Amino acid sequence: MVPSRRTWNLGATPSLRGLWRVGRAPEPEPGMARPAPAPASPAARPFPHTGPGRLRTGRGKDTPVCGDEDSSARSAARPALAQCRALSVDWAGPGSPHGLYLTLQVEHLKEKLISQAQEVSRLRSELGGTDLEKHRDLLMVENERLRQEMRRCEAELQELRTKPAGPCPGCEHSQESAQLRDKLSQLQLEMAESKGMLSELNLEVQQKTDRLAEVELRLKDCLAEKAQEEERLSRRLRDSHETIASLRAQSPPVKYVIKTVEVESSKTKQALSESQARNQHLQEQVAMQRQVLKEMEQQLQSSHQLTARLRAQIAMYESELERAHGQMLEEMQSLEEDKNRAIEEAFARAQVEMKAVHENLAGVRTNLLTLQPALRTLTNDYNGLKRQVRGFPLLLQEALRSVKAEIGQAIEEVNSNNQELLRKYRRELQLRKKCHNELVRLKGNIRVIARVRPVTKEDGEGPEATNAVTFDADDDSIIHLLHKGKPVSFELDKVFSPQASQQDVFQEVQALVTSCIDGFNVCIFAYGQTGAGKTYTMEGTAENPGINQRALQLLFSEVQEKASDWEYTITVSAAEIYNEVLRDLLGKEPQEKLEIRLCPDGSGQLYVPGLTEFQVQSVDDINKVFEFGHTNRTTEFTNLNEHSSRSHALLIVTVRGVDCSTGLRTTGKLNLVDLAGSERVGKSGAEGSRLREAQHINKSLSALGDVIAALRSRQGHVPFRNSKLTYLLQDSLSGDSKTLMVVQVSPVEKNTSETLYSLKFAERVRSVELGPGLRRAELGSWSSQEHLEWEPACQTPQPSARAHSAPSSGTSSRPGSIRRKLQPSGKSRPLPV
């Protein structure tokens, strides 16, 4: 059976496959006209099946339509019309190129508005009246000063006017008139300068006005471009709305009523459901795009309002600027008129006063003519007095005696004043030296002090044993040497005479020694010819110890004072350089050769593997260590010195401290160096091994001179490795420590050449700048790579193992001796030198 049929125009209505192709059509390119979508077929409900694989149609396309059939066809065509409308506005959706283009245009307009607001803010800050107000205030102050000057001139003229006419010796009024004219010319010059400043201010105002006009022109161009862009976007928007309206106004293309359509394929049903879903998605996109267009219109309207406000503000700023400029010009013009009027009045008054002065001058001349008879009378009186003067010799002698007494008293007063001035000069000299020492400390210069030994019996007698060294009575940093009949002066940090004691010398270096406790590296070395007293200054005797023992005693006293807050450990090592061989003075085998190496931890410091290290707890321990070291040091007899040191001795004192409250660790090192004396082989009579020793000593001291010369000239390469001595002193001379040199000199005539060389070397060393010393301190606990083993105190301090590496920790000083043992499994840090 065939069901009742409804009419369907197969020539005008596309099939379902055609509708599917329309739904999947690609989007048109931006700027091109979008073709109108094809009308959709009715897809509101599935059609009844009539047979497999085909659609049944009823009447032909000319068959008339009944009433109920017409209403059914309309209801069935509504989904197709909705899909057609959705396709007509789909080109303006959020994902379409044209919608993206509109969004970009709106963002571009927003950026333009922001840049214009920034430009207006910049103009507002540039066109502020701060500079103009400052210039105006300066001009007002200048005009006020000129007014005060005019008032002062008027007061002087008034004083001249009120002064009674009388004799005018020396033309005083003429001089005052000349001064008034000079003041008048000065006021005119100041007025010209004020006019120049005014013209410069006007020029600056004109430049700012031109700049403002230029900025306004640029702003107007930007606003015009923005208006054109807005007009173009509005036009495009109107075209889009018109296109949408025209597409909506089109009548649906369905002209015939569907009669009967039956779907006989499951694939066709699926295509129909997909088409309906796409219809719904397109409708949502249209609603979303309409909302976006509405927001864009609101943003565009707000940008228009902001532009109008900015234009109004610019106009207001222009009016304020013009008003301020006008007020300033009026004020300046009025001030200039007042100034000109005051100058003219002062000039007129000065002319009147000049006339009065000339009249007074004429009266004075008349008075002079009348005084000539009186002058003749006075001449006669003078002749009479002259005759009387012949009887005044006795009176003159009496007067001379009184004058001599007064002169003697004046001389005594001058002498007392000179004594007071000399006392003040010496006080200022001491203050200058103190300031100079502080400057040297800040710069890091090597401080140099000189000590002159007394004349001894080894110097002999005769002309060669006379004293060739003198001192400045007012300045203790100046030393004078008489060399070959010519005096030579040297300036050092401090000069000690032969009468100076060991304590006096130690007081000069005491501050450096105490800085070792605070974590600084300190080096004190003695330099000079053989027999000049270096070993005596550094080591001294048992009754009168030198710097070495006094320094350690001072360290122990300082450690005891800080025992409540700090824990300190003091270790001592001693070495000598004999014939360019480094030997351990405290070891069991003093003849063993040691080497100087770099620390493997990358710190750049030097250390001596195998150097014996003693931990000392008291002064008795120090004395025992010194005695043990003295027995191993090399000394021999020469013609110049009975106990000549044939090696460079080095005493290394390491102070490690821990702050009990903060855990701060400090490590300070004190190097006390007793250099072997330079000598001339002809004088010392060295032969054999003594000659070889002298050659090595002179070679190492020459290398030290090369290092000082390189440091003084700030060369890039400093030859520290030319000798064991300079290599060992590298840390002390490379700017990481506080260094002091004690130069020992002989005062007798036969040693003036060596004394001259030593003092010249001292001056060169004094000019070397190493930089301020660095404090070695860090927070944290001591390294746990070593452990301490306590042993009871014994008669002789025991060495703390052969120092294959530097100790990394320490403990507080306690009774008894401490021996440091390295753990077999641990690797300790190398000992820095």
Curated annotation (Swiss-Prot):
Q: Which GO terms describe its cellular component?
A: centrosome; cytoplasmic vesicle membrane; extracellular exosome; Golgi apparatus; kinesin complex; microtubule; microtubule cytoskeleton; mitochondrion
Keyword flag Membrane: yes
Under the heading PROSITE patterns, the entry gives: KINESIN_MOTOR_1, KINESIN_MOTOR_2
The record ties this protein, via Gene3D superfamilies, to: 1.10.287.1490, Kinesin motor domain
InterPro entries in the record: Kinesin-like_fam, Kinesin_motor_CS, Kinesin_motor_dom, Kinesin_motor_dom_sf, P-loop_NTPase
List keywords of the entry alphabetically: ATP-binding, Cell junction, Coiled coil, Cytoplasm, Cytoplasmic vesicle, Cytoskeleton, Membrane, Microtubule, Motor protein, Nucleotide-binding, Phosphoprotein
What positions are modified (Phosphoserine)?
Answer: 813, 817
- According to Swiss-Prot or TrEMBL, what is its membrane topology? Peripheral membrane protein
Primary localisation category: other
Against SMART domains, the record matches this protein to: KISc (SM00129)
Indicate, by first and last residue, each region the UniProt record lists as having compositional bias (Polar residues): 806-815
Protein's cellular compartments: Cell junction, Adherens junction; Cytoplasm, Cytoskeleton, Microtubule organizing center, Centrosome; Cytoplasmic vesicle membrane
The UniProt entry's coiled-coil ranges are 102-362, 395-432
Instruction: Give positions of region: Disordered.
Output: 19-74, 786-833
Q: Supply the CDD domains for this chain.
A: KISc_C_terminal (cd01366)
State its role: Minus-end microtubule-dependent motor protein. Involved in apically targeted transport. Required for zonula adherens maintenance.
Name-wise, this protein is Kinesin-like protein KIFC3
